[in-house]
């Protein structure tokens, strides 16, 4: 596998995630874009770990750690979104200011 191709793929995923996170008005879509960013970072960890030192598994282990953190973040984020939806009947970011009411 060519290093440049994987890095370009990761950069595309990261850019799509950042663009979606900036322009998203829906909380669920923002969480999905954040997960896309974390997956792009994981691709970089695994790629550099394989390319520079394939005998050690530091990048792979760190990638598994990031996946576990991302799963916990997604679970907590979706719980918060469902709680806000139950109270506000909307998942739009600009309508969920909890300090107003």
Curated annotation (Swiss-Prot):
For whether the record's keyword set contains Plastid, the answer is: yes
* A molecular function (GO) term: oxidoreductase activity, acting on NAD(P)H, quinone or similar compound as acceptor
Q: Where is this protein found? A: Plastid, Chloroplast thylakoid membrane
GO CC annotations, alphabetized? chloroplast thylakoid membrane; NADH dehydrogenase complex
Q: Which InterPro entries match?
A: NADH_UbQ_OxRdtase_chain4L/K (IPR001133), NUOK/Mnh_C1-like (IPR039428)
- Record has DNA repair as a keyword: no
Membrane-spanning intervals of the chain: 2-22, 32-52, 61-81
Q: Which domain of life is it from?
A: Eukaryota
Q: How does it sit in the membrane?
A: Multi-pass membrane protein
Instruction: Provide this UniProt record's keywords sorted from A to Z.
Output: Chloroplast, Membrane, NAD, NADP, Plastid, Plastoquinone, Quinone, Thylakoid, Translocase, Transmembrane, Transmembrane helix, Transport
The biological processes this protein is annotated with in GO are: ATP synthesis coupled electron transport; photosynthesis, light reaction
Pfam families of this UniProt entry? Answer: Oxidored_q2
Under Enzyme Commission nomenclature, its number is: 7.1.1.-
Q: Which reaction does it catalyse?
A: a plastoquinone + NADH + (n+1) H(+)(in) = a plastoquinol + NAD(+) + n H(+)(out); a plastoquinone + NADPH + (n+1) H(+)(in) = a plastoquinol + NADP(+) + n H(+)(out)
Q: What does this protein do?
A: NDH shuttles electrons from NAD(P)H:plastoquinone, via FMN and iron-sulfur (Fe-S) centers, to quinones in the photosynthetic chain and possibly in a chloroplast respiratory chain. The immediate electron acceptor for the enzyme in this species is believed to be plastoquinone. Couples the redox reaction to proton translocation, and thus conserves the redox energy in a proton gradient.
Annotated family: Belongs to the complex I subunit 4L family.
Q: Which NCBIfam families match?
A: PRK05715.1-2, PRK05715.1-4, PRK05715.1-5
Subunit-level organization: NDH is composed of at least 16 different subunits, 5 of which are encoded in the nucleus.
Q: What is this protein called?
A: NAD(P)H-quinone oxidoreductase subunit 4L, chloroplastic
Please report the organism this UniProt entry assigns to the protein.
Eucalyptus globulus subsp. globulus
Gene that codes for this?
A: ndhE
């Amino acid at each position: 596998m060519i290093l440049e191709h994987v890095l370009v793929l990761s950069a595309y995923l990261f850019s799509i995630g950042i663009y979606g996170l900036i322009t998203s008005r829906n909380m669920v879509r923002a969480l999905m874009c954040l997960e896309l960013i974390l997956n792009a970072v994981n691709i970089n960890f695994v790629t550099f770990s394989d390319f520079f030192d394939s005998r050690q598994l530091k990048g792979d282990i760190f990638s598994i750690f990031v996946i576990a953190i991302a799963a916990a973040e997604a679970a907590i984020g979706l719980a918060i979104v469902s709680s806000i939806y139950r109270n506000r009947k909307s998942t739009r970011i600009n309508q969920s200011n909890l300090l107003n009411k």
